Amino acid sequence: MKESINILAIESSCDETSAAVVVNGREVLSNIIASQISTHEKFGGVVPEVASRKHIEVISAVVQEALDEANFTLDDIDAIGVTYGPGLVGALLVGLQYAKGLAFATGKPLIGVNHIEGHISANFIEYKDLKPPFMCLVVSGGHTFIVYMKDYGEFEVLGETRDDAAGEAFDKVARAIGLGYPGGPKIDKISKEGNEEAIKFPRANFHNDTLDFSFSGIKSAVLNYLNKKEMKGEEINKADVAASFQKSVVDVLVDNTIKACMSKKVDKIAVAGGVASNSCLRETLVRECKKKGIEVLIPPFILCTDNAAMIGSAAYFEYIKGRRTSLDINAVPNLKLGER
């Protein structure tokens, strides 16, 4: 095998169009991201059809910019990695069809990547010496998982949400208290001005050994609290609501992740996904894990949110295992972790 394997990666599962060039799964030569946040902000969330159209408008330029920044041409690329699920089907199709076209035209192998696997692999970029096994907490707008990574590309899901993802709950609560979209960063910011002990919102604790999550109850409790305040004409302290809600979500995420580590006897937790940039989650996880002798690994913000570099990293580890994807592959919006 060549000393250096160069992956051109493409990500378009939601509202970021991204392309990257990644070498050997850990070195990022370029990572171009065209965000649509300003486009969707006025709608209070991502509009799937609008997202697809925006991907179509920019994908060619984004891929070319990624190649140019890396000082590469397609001749220098060994394989093309692309997200094929989970995500918004229309958005996924834009990146997938573009990648399939490149693979067909150049004869380069295509590697379909699970978006969640990409988030986990972002840690290999930031932590060059990181190797499995380790635990990973994946928290984003659409996904919440506790994953035991046994080996490269081999996962065991120990816990997942039974309803709303953590990031989805953040967005809905932010909208309810008038903070707008995207909710996660705005709740994180205003929470710094609030008292996290001001309101006791419930935590979902299941009565068996499951490590699953449920955030719909917390979200509903916040909405009920707001409705009662409005009906009584009482003032609502947005900062206190945000801080108390955030703490209730973070406490459950941290507790279950530490339990998972103890059950598998691992001493490393990697964090992935957009909600991993939340300051309360970072601080609480580091503080509580220190008490248990568990190391916490958290990538920088740009690698927590959707990006193609993480897809390139995951694609590399698939490539060296000899896995290739047929050009007949289709988008799978509800793709499960570990499915191929």
Curated annotation (Swiss-Prot):
This is tRNA N6-adenosine threonylcarbamoyltransferase. Required for the formation of a threonylcarbamoyl group on adenosine at position 37 (t(6)A37) in tRNAs that read codons beginning with adenine. Is involved in the transfer of the threonylcarbamoyl moiety of threonylcarbamoyl-AMP (TC-AMP) to the N6 group of A37, together with TsaE and TsaB. TsaD likely plays a direct catalytic role in this reaction. Its cofactor is Fe(2+). PANTHER family: TRNA N6-ADENOSINE THREONYLCARBAMOYLTRANSFERASE, TRNA N6-ADENOSINE THREONYLCARBAMOYLTRANSFERASE, MITOCHONDRIAL. Belongs to the KAE1 / TsaD family. It comes from Clostridium botulinum (strain Hall / ATCC 3502 / NCTC 13319 / Type A). Binds 1 Fe(2+) ion per subunit. GO terms for molecular function: iron ion binding; N(6)-L-threonylcarbamoyladenine synthase activity. Keywords: Acyltransferase, Cytoplasm, Iron, Metal-binding, Transferase, tRNA processing. Substrate binds at residues 138-142, 171, 184, 188, 278. InterPro entries: ATPase_NBD, Gcp-like_dom, KAE1/TsaD, TsaD. GO terms for biological process: tRNA threonylcarbamoyladenosine modification. Its main location: cytoplasm. The lineage of its organism: Bacteria, Bacillati, Bacillota, Clostridia, Eubacteriales. One of its GO terms (cellular component) is cytoplasm. The gene is tsaD. Fe cation binds at residues 115, 119, 306. Its EC number is 2.3.1.234. Pfam families: TsaD (PF00814). It catalyses: L-threonylcarbamoyladenylate + adenosine(37) in tRNA = N(6)-L-threonylcarbamoyladenosine(37) in tRNA + AMP + H(+). It is found in: Cytoplasm. The keyword tRNA processing applies.
